[in-house]
Amino acid sequence: MSKMTDHLDRPVVVVTGLGVITSLGVGTKDNWDALSAGRSGIHPIRRFPTDDLKTRISGTVDFLDSSDKGPSALTYEMAEATATEALAEAGLGDGDFGGPLFLAAPPVELSWRDRFDLYRMSTEGAGYRRLLTGAVKPEASGYYETTQFGSIADRLADRFGTRGLPITLST
């Protein structure tokens, strides 16, 4: 390609590698095989009780090591696995990418399990005040990193050797 911009002078983007995780599986091959075979990734929701909900099925990814460890851990595992697959497919190493990192991530929040853990760390007060009292205890320090907006992108940037400040976009 002799020209690196399109007719409106925008940079041309070429996809050279792809990484995929869906409720059907991990990797482009597993997903393509499942889709081609007509399999569905829709199944009963198991992450939380659905007794009083109208929707009880979903296409959740609940088979990864981090699937029950909260949204930040799951987001990191999915991003790391898909980036590794995409870089391998593109023929690039995964330790010195050399380019910028742009990450689309879900909102950063504590899982309900984590909130209940923080609440149980204290016996002082009630409600939100008790949760906050638990959150400042030394044994709660691990929750801090997982709830920082850019922490997942920072870890990915370190893992893949990207350049510049990583950028995270969230809904």
Predicted regions and their residues:
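Short beta->alpha junction loops
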Residues: 168-171
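Conserved "HGTGT" condensation-loop signature of ketosynthase/thiolase-family condensing enzymes
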Residues: 1-166
